[in-house]
Structures are given as C-alpha cells and as structure tokens.
Swiss-Prot record:
Organism: Trypanosoma brucei brucei (strain 927/4 GUTat10.1)
Gene Ontology molecular function, alphabetical: histone deacetylase activity; histone deacetylase activity, NAD-dependent; metal ion binding; NAD+ binding; NAD+ poly-ADP-ribosyltransferase activity
GO cellular component terms listed in the entry, alphabetical order: chromosome, telomeric region; cytoplasm; cytosol; nucleus
Active site: H142
Role, per record: NAD-dependent protein deacetylase, which is involved in repression of RNA polymerase I-mediated expression immediately adjacent to telomeres. It is however not involved in antigenic variation and subtelomeric variant surface glycoprotein (VSG) gene silencing. Plays a role in DNA damage response. Also has ADP-ribosylation activity in vitro.
Region (Disordered): 260-284
Enzyme class: transferase
Catalytic activity field: N(6)-acetyl-L-lysyl-[protein] + NAD(+) + H2O = 2''-O-acetyl-ADP-D-ribose + nicotinamide + L-lysyl-[protein]
UniProt name for this protein: NAD-dependent protein deacetylase SIR2rp1
Coiled-coil boundaries: none
UniProt key word Metal-binding: yes
Compartment(s) where it occurs, according to its Swiss-Prot or TrEMBL record: Nucleus; Chromosome, Telomere
Cofactor(s) required, per the database record: Zn(2+)
Length: 351
C-alpha cells in the first residue's frame, strides 16, 4: 500500500490565531458553526462532567451507582427520584444562578456581527440564552433548565414552582397526573429535541467550525464534527486533545491510513445527515480513537487546528486577532454588571 504523504500545507494558511483571523477576513466568513460543551462553563463555577476529582461524575460515588450516567436516566428517576433531585440541589442550574463566561460572550458577539450560523450546545445551564445568543441561532441539544414537564403525561410545569420546590428539598409532581416532574433536559436514552436534527441542513452551509470545551464523547452531538464539508476548517479549543483520530492537527506526525474507507462508509464531508431514528443520547469513552477522518491526508493539506489550554484565554486571544478584543471585554464587563444587579434585586426580594 502506498502511504499518503505527510500534510505540508493548511487550508487557512498559518494555523494560528492571526492566521485564522486572516482566513476569516480574506474569505468573508459569515457562516460559523459553533459546538460547545461543559468546558466553556467551568469558569462560571459550574463543574464539567468528566474531569477527575472535580467533575460532576467524580462526585457521584456516594450514590453507589452502576455508572455515573445512571444519575441521568429515567428508570432511576422513577425508582429513586431523590437521587436526581439531590444532585440537582448541588448543581443548582436554574436560570440566574451563574454568570456567562468570556466564551459565551464571544459567541454572542459573533451573532451580533452576523457571523454566527448556529451555536449547538451540549450544556443545560442556559448561559447561551443568558448572554443574548438569539434563540433562532441556538440549539440546546440536551435541553435546558428554562422549562420543566411531567415525565409521564408531558404536561408543562411552572418553572419557578419547580425551582422553589427543588430548593426546599422536595420532588415536584405533576398537577394533572401526579407524575414526577423534571427540568426539560435530555437524559441518557431519551430522544434529543427535533431542533437538533434540523441543524443537519445547516452543516452543508458551514464555512468554519469552532469546537469549544467538549470531550466529544456523547453521541449524536459529537457526530456534527464529522458532517461539515471536507474543505471546511475545524478548530478545537480545549484543555486537552479530544476526538482521537477524528482530527489531524499540524503537530501530528503520523498520517492516517484509513480515512478513505471510513469516509466512504459514513458519507462524511458530503453534508450527510444524522438520522432522527438514532435520536437517543448516548455516551462513549472511545473519543473516536478507532476512527480517522483526516480527509485531506491524501492531498497533503490539513484543515484542523488545535488551541490547547483554557478556552477562555484562547478565545480572548482569538477575539484580539479578529480585531474585537476590546468589544469582547466590554461585553463581559456589561454582562457581569447586569448579572450582579439582578442578583442583588433577587436577594432583596427573597430576604
């Protein structure tokens, strides 16, 4: 077998913040698709799921669950609702509790500048909404705490009442059928919202993919990164590398040998769609280690970029390269001031 040659060039030119900014300006990029995960909310004080010792899963050992995912499953909710609601009291992700981060404001700024095609988030904390990302450009793939409903009859339940009962240590029950009420977040094994599958049509229009603060271990959300056209740059902002050989970054020295065969089997890079028939939320620890999707290996051209480290810091540097670092700083300050004023008013009312 003839080995593919090592990539020598990159579709954006120079794979740096400045090079990426020049690529955006040179090509008049206005259709940026953003995928975000729990890592962008850690700076707000919300733990992510998988970090050792500090992540949410690491804190679930006292419940003696078979797996951490069981805490977010309907069978356990029905059998032992107190487990989920005790976790809910610890998380306290109801609207207004946490302040959006620099990354949230960066995405909102992209929207204001007409550069955001879609923000698809795994997060259930609602901080994308809180920082002003328009609902028309936002897909909450795993739901949010902005509403609640009965798990049996699906009747809507007043979100403020659900929050008050939860904070009082009670399990909310439906006024109509008596079933257990939960926030409208997607549990493992539940179907994702229809809005998630509608974004597949946007994938074909994507001109740049930004991936921020996600482990890419939950499907079908992670599959979105496979669906953008094969010449579209994919940029990962994360503490550590994820995605296995889904990506090939400029620092990688080992070429991928199975790209063509896997691409043919998935239809990757041709606007392929995620089927709503496979719509349940599932978790995987493989991180795509067994796959390889570096489509441009054969041509000697790369399209992936990895900016390791704190995504808040990296995004601030990226915004600076784009020429709106000061606007981002101002947006963060204003957002913090509004958040603190609102919190003070709420404390006065509660007091």
């Amino acid at each position: 077998m003839t080995e593919p040659k090592l990539a020598t060039t990159h579709v954006v030119g120079e794979p740096t913040f400045e090079g990426l900014a020049r690529f955006i300006e040179r090509n008049n990029i206005t259709k940026i698709f953003v995928m975000v995960g729990a890592g962008i909310s850690v700076a707000a004080g919300i733990p992510d799921f998988r970090s050792p010792h500090t992540g949410l899963y690491a804190k679930l050992s006292r419940y003696n669950l078979n797996s951490p995912e069981d805490a977010f499953s309907l069978p356990l909710l029905r059998q032992q609702p107190s487990v989920f609601y005790n976790i809910l009291m610890d998380m306290d992700l109801w609207p207004g509790k946490y302040c959006p981060t620099t990354v949230h404001h960066f995405i909102s700024l992209l929207a204001k500048k007409g550069m955001l095609l879609c923000c698809c988030t795994q997060n259930i904390d609602g901080l994308e909404r809180a920082c002003g990302i328009p609902e028309s450009l936002l897909v909450e793939a795993h739901g949010s705490f902005s509403s609640a409903s009965c798990v049996d009859c699906h009747a809507k339940y007043d979100i403020n009442m659900a929050r008050a009962e939860t904070r009082a240590g009670k399990v909310p029950h439906c006024n109509q059928c008596g079933g257990i009420v939960k926030p409208d977040v997607v549990f493992f094994g539940e179907n994702l919202p229809e809005a998630f599958f509608n974004v597949a049509g946007l994938i074909e229009e994507t001109e740049l993919l930004l991936i921020l603060g996600t482990s890419l271990q939950v499907h079908p959300f992670a599959d979105l990164a496979l669906m953008v056209p094969s010449d579209v740059p994919r940029v990962l902002f994360n503490l550590e590398r994820v995605g296995g050989r889904m990506f090939r970054f400029p620092t990688d020295r080992t070429p991928n040998f199975r790209a063509s065969s896997y691409r043919l089997s998935t239809g990757n890079g041709n606007g392929s769609k995620i089927s709503s028939g496979d719509s349940s939320n599932s978790s995987s620890v493989d991180g795509y280690d067994q796959f390889t999707l570096a489509e441009n290996d054969e041509t000697g051209v790369l399209r992936d970029i990895f900016f390791p480290g704190d995504c808040q810091v990296s995004v601030r540097s990226f915004a600076q390269a784009l020429g709106f670092g000061e606007q981002l700083d101002a947006s963060v300050r204003e957002g913090r001031e509004i958040f603190e004023r609102t919190r003070r008013r709420e404390k006065v009312v509660e007091g």
